Amino acid sequence: ESLIEAYREMLPDATETELAIELGTDFTFKIPAIRLAEDRVARGADTWVYQFDWESRNAHLKATHALEIPFAFNMLMATGVDAFIGKGELPQAVADEMHGVWTSFIQGDEPSWPKYDLEKRTVQHFDNNSSVVENGELPRLNAWEGIR
């Protein structure tokens, strides 16, 4: 089975453009980040993984690279951020949650979700309704096995 066929199975309603974006995102960001987490765990390092899923109201951006930065630093009101996150009510609850996790971690506290391990592969997903997911990316990881 080819990588593209695997993605078509995982995302049956995706257009060709959406499939290309998913493949590119995973190649550039997601798979390397997961491989780094796997390597850290294999070396005995405490590791937590998060994924920022809140989608910009700018339809072309979705949950694009670096969109989480104004949330992590609680800077949704900063000049120019609205161009990045889109117009409308500020998603302050998401920023409060993410900023709280980051500042607690900086101060030496552990995140509230379980550490990443090679069995459960726990990931915290930040969104309007944040959640903790186990093995959510396993089909993608399996598709990339031996490739990246």
Predicted regions and their residues:
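Tryptophan-centered motif/residue detector
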Residues: 54, 102, 113-115, 144
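Substrate-gating cap/lid region and adjacent catalytic-acid/histidine neighborhood
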Residues: 1-89, 101, 108
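Tryptophan-rich aromatic "cage" segments
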Residues: 131-148
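Small/flexible residues
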Residues: 10, 122-123, 142
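Conserved loop-to-helix N-cap of the C-terminal "lid" that shapes the substrate pocket in Rossmann-like
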Residues: 92-95
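C-terminal catalytic lobe of FAD-dependent flavoproteins
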Residues: 98
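Mature extracytoplasmic/periplasmic domains
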Residues: 108-136
